[in-house]
A protein has these predicted regions:
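Aromatic-rich juxtamembrane segments at the membrane interface
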Residues: 2-13, 21, 160-286, 291-292, ...
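OB-fold single-stranded nucleic acid-binding module
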Residues: 103-185
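Alpha-helical transmembrane signal-anchor/signal-peptide segments
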Residues: 79-99
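Alpha-helical transmembrane segments of multi-pass integral membrane proteins
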Residues: 335-443
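Hydrophobic alpha-helical transmembrane segments in multi-pass membrane proteins
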Residues: 18, 59-62, 218-386, 450-484
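C-terminal regulatory/interaction regions
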Residues: 2-16, 20-23, 33-36, 417-484
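Divalent metal-coordination and catalytic microenvironments
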Residues: 26, 100, 152, 208, ...
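N-terminal leader/targeting segments
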Residues: 1-86, 162-166, 282
């Protein structure tokens, strides 16, 4: 009986998921292993050879072989990803002039300094691997995709950044022609929104709709962090999911093809406007895979979707897996929404369909539970008002996005633009006041410090709890689809 179960054939998706899980672990593990060019090629060939019997026989017993195969290929890809990074060992601690392309929209830190993320690096005309974190007091209007020259002392990097440069002096700033067209369209639209809506309110609305962060007042940005609301004003899976669901539902009854095309256009357009940050890369990939499955009448199990999407993002950029907190939090919150949330609802409410309020409550709570250990380990602080803040604000985010969009589109139409801007301002003002009030409470946040092994224990407990709820409810998670 045991042998029959071990030789039972599985659907190919489970074997691919196991392989992707191994690849993810392999890429992450490379960062903690010594470099070895000889082993690198052996790992690639070994991984390919091991996966052949997995594809041929598809036995349950071969799941572990699939994981090992993926792990070996992951080691190979991770080693390729850190090729050339050894040069930073010679550069750290020295003053250097580095040219690079601005990868994401610039941020403003608590001191009012500009934070830049550079890729396509060059030093003395030679290509330099990796990405650079730059902090500067320069106030010039630098945009995504600009080519800049930064001079300063290099210090050790963190996460996906190979090195950091603080108090950098910015020299040449070049804007390619035509440059990043999506940024130009976005900035043009943002100006239309600001025509009739006050600064703070327009900044919040544009944060919802376009992921714009730089224009947001520092005080409002800090209060949103304290209230646990940062995720709604950066380009995230939540904002993208709202847009994709809207596009699909508008056309689904008329034409499935038109619904798919409009939703896919929304995904590509939103990613072009907001940029390919780690969290946005994950969100776009997951939304695209889920949309394709819906269009072809298929379903993807969350336990397949998670490792597959993680592996694809790491194949594209293995540095995401080397301590990039945005990448980690993105997958943690996604796990909460597509696995923990359905289990909690089934466990406590049975087969009763969730209303909007209950769905938001459970999904928000689930995302916060799964991201909590990472947040405590990384920031040593926890928001005590996050759940309240999300319940007060999250239900109105889709309406705020719609009104902000309408305000921008109709801004040039006399009277109508101002008429649309009025309720938009009222709604956004309510959200700002709610966030400010919650952030002002003495008990709004507390300091908590945990170690990596305590973080691991917390996640082990979560996995155990989810396994228990799955066993008790017998919920089939394959029914979950984020685009429906």
């Amino acid at each position: 009986m045991a042998i029959r179960r071990l030789t039972e054939k599985l659907h190919i998706s489970w074997l691919v998921a196991a392989w992707c899980l191994g690849l993810t672990v392999g890429v992450i593990a490379v960062h903690h292993l010594p470099r070895s060019v000889e082993f690198n090629m052996l790992a690639l060939f070994g991984g390919i050879i091991l996966f052949v019997p997995v594809l041929v026989w598809r036995w349950r017993a071969l799941l572990i072989v699939a994981v090992i195969s993926g792990g070996l290929v992951g080691l190979w890809r991770g080693e390729l990803g850190r090729a050339g990074l050894e040069v930073y060992d010679l550069l750290i601690g020295k003053t250097a002039v580095i040219q690079g392309r601005v990868l994401e929209d610039p941020d403003i830190d608590k001191k009012g300094q500009t934070v830049l993320r550079l890729s396509d690096l060059r030093i003395n005309g030679e290509k330099l691997a990796g990405q650079l974190w730059v902090v500067t007091a320069d106030k010039r209007p630098i945009k995504r995709s600009d080519i800049i020259q930064a001079q300063g002392k290099l210090t050790a990097g963190f996460g996906a950044f190979s090195a950091s440069m603080y108090r950098a002096k910015i020299g040449i700033v070049e804007r390619p022609v035509p440059g990043d067209v999506a940024v130009g369209v976005r900035d043009w639209f943002a100006e239309r929104v600001r025509k009739h809506i006050p600064e703070s309110e327009s900044a919040l609305g544009l944060g919802f709709l376009l992921g714009l962060r730089r224009a947001m007042p520092t005080e409002l940005s800090d209060n949103l962090k304290i209230a646990g609301l940062t995720h709604i004003v950066v380009a995230s899976g939540y904002n993208l999911t709202i847009l994709v669901r809207l596009a699909r539902r508008l056309f689904a009854k008329r034409s499935k093809y038109l619904a798919m095309l409009s939703a896919a256009t929304m995904i590509l357009g939103f990613m072009a406007v907001t940029g390919l940050s780690p969290s946005m890369s994950r969100a776009g990939l997951v939304a695209g895979l889920s949309l394709a499955a819906w269009y072809y009448g298929r379903t993807i199990h969350p336990l397949v979707l998670l490792p597959v999407s993680a592996a694809i993002t790491l194949l594209v950029n293995p540095q995401f897996g080397w301590g990039d907190l945005g990448w980690q939090l993105s997958f943690a919150s996604f796990t909460g929404v597509i696995i923990l949330a359905p289990l909690l609802h089934k466990y406590f409410f049975g087969d009763k369909e969730p209303g909007t309020f209950r769905q938001i409550l459970i999904e928000t709570l689930s995302a916060q539970i799964v991201t909590l250990p990472l947040l405590m380990m990384s920031f040593d602080v926890v928001s005590n008002v996050a759940l309240i803040a999300n319940m007060l604000i999250l239900p109105f985010v889709p309406l705020a996005m719609l009104l902000t969009f309408a305000s921008g589109v109709l801004a040039v139409v006399p009277m109508i633009g101002a008429a649309i801007a009025l309720p938009t301002t009222w709604l956004l003002s309510y959200m700002i006041q709610a966030a400010n009030w919650l952030a002002s409470l003495e008990w709004a946040q507390m300091e908590v410090n945990i170690t990596w092994w305590q973080c691991g224990l917390m996640y082990a407990a979560m996995i155990g709890a989810m396994w228990w709820m799955k066993k008790q409810t017998k919920l089939d998670l394959i029914q979950v689809n984020i685009v429906e």
